[in-house]
């Protein structure tokens, strides 16, 4: 079994982002990715990861308003995992790899093949795209971060465009948009790192909360879902070998 610990925060209390790679115990086993809803923990990461791999996982495919879903049940007798959610539902389309199928409405035990724990900042220091978008009224433009990574094994560069937020810009300010992108955002990001969670997400540390980042606390972490950008890449390969080198910004008018 493989275990990975990504310490993006060194505080005594942190947000735990846990992801499992499991194999269904079946004659025709399905391969699944399971991510646990984030939870707060003050247990040392090294101790927590040891307990995370000693759990029993049951999976059942169900139908919901959001489409095919998986009902996850995690059983553990460890007091260390008392804060971890043990019953939750995730998207089957994201969880199952393209070659795997699960029987409908049948509860199946799974074997853990790998477990990843990422230590993020505490809950009030985390922000998502949805959090920012909800605070924008009558948006006129979108801010896209172009995050550049270098594959340290091949020296090839990959640019991942990620939607950050929508903003409202008055007509008289349109000419200064480019200047905003190169000044207010210049020192906004200190690093960006890919972590395994719900497939893959990008964690951006924000140091300057002016302009487009005014609703984000300084030194907080901004979480961006990468969606299908990296679906053909190995999670372990990407998290191990991709190094963030630069971030540029693009401000685009919202199309009708």
From Swiss-Prot:
It is a peripheral membrane protein. The keyword Kinase does not apply. GO terms for biological process: virion assembly. GO terms for cellular component: host cell cytoplasm; host cell nucleus; host cell plasma membrane; membrane; viral envelope. It comes from the Viruses. GO terms for molecular function: structural constituent of virion. Pfam families: Matrix_Pneumo_C (PF23766), Matrix_Pneumo_N (PF03393). Keywords: Host cell membrane, Host cytoplasm, Host membrane, Host nucleus, Host-virus interaction, Membrane, Viral matrix protein, Virion. It is found in: Virion; Host cytoplasm; Host nucleus; Host cell membrane. Its main location: virion. The keyword Transcription does not apply. Gene3D superfamilies: HRSV-S2 matrix protein, N-terminal domain. Belongs to the pneumovirinae M protein family. Plays a crucial role in virus assembly into filaments and budding. Early in infection, localizes in the nucleus where it may inhibit host cell transcription. Later in infection, traffics to the cytoplasm to associate with inclusion bodies, the site of viral transcription and replication. During virus assembly and budding, acts as a bridge between the nucleocapsid and the lipid bilayer. Forms dimers. Forms higher-order oligomers. Interacts with glycoprotein G (via N-terminus). Interacts with protein M2-1; this interaction directs the matrix protein localization to cytoplasmic inclusions comprising viral proteins L, N, P, and M2-1 and mediates the matrix protein association with the nucleocapsid. This is Matrix protein. The gene is M.
């Amino acid at each position: 079994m493989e275990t990975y610990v990504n310490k993006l925060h060194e505080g005594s209390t942190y947000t735990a982002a846990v992801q499992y790679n499991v194999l269904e115990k079946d004659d025709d086993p399905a391969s699944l990715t399971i991510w646990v809803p984030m939870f707060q923990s003050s247990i040392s990461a090294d101790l927590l990861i040891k307990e995370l791999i000693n759990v029993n996982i049951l999976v059942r495919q169900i139908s919901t308003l959001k489409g095919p879903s998986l009902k996850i049940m995690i059983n553990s007798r460890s007091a260390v995992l008392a804060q971890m959610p043990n019953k939750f539902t995730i998207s089957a389309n994201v969880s199952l790899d393209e070659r795997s199928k699960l029987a409908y409405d049948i509860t199946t035990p799974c074997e853990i093949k790998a477990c990843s724990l990422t230590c993020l900042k505490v809950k009030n220091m985390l922000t998502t795209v949805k959090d920012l978008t909800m605070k924008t009224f009558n948006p006129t433009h979108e801010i896209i971060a172009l995050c550049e990574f270098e594959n340290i094994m091949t020296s090839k560069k990959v640019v991942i465009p990620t939607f950050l937020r929508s903003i409202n810009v008055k007509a008289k300010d349109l000419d200064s948009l480019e200047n905003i992108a190169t000044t207010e955002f210049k020192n906004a990001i200190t690093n960006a790192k890919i972590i395994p969670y719900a497939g893959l997400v990008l964690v951006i540390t924000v140091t300057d909360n002016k302009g487009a980042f005014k609703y984000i606390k300084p030194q907080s972490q901004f979480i961006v879902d990468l969606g299908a950008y990296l679906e053909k890449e190995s999670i372990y390969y990407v998290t191990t070998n991709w190094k963030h080198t630069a971030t540029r910004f693009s401000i685009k008018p919202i199309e009708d």
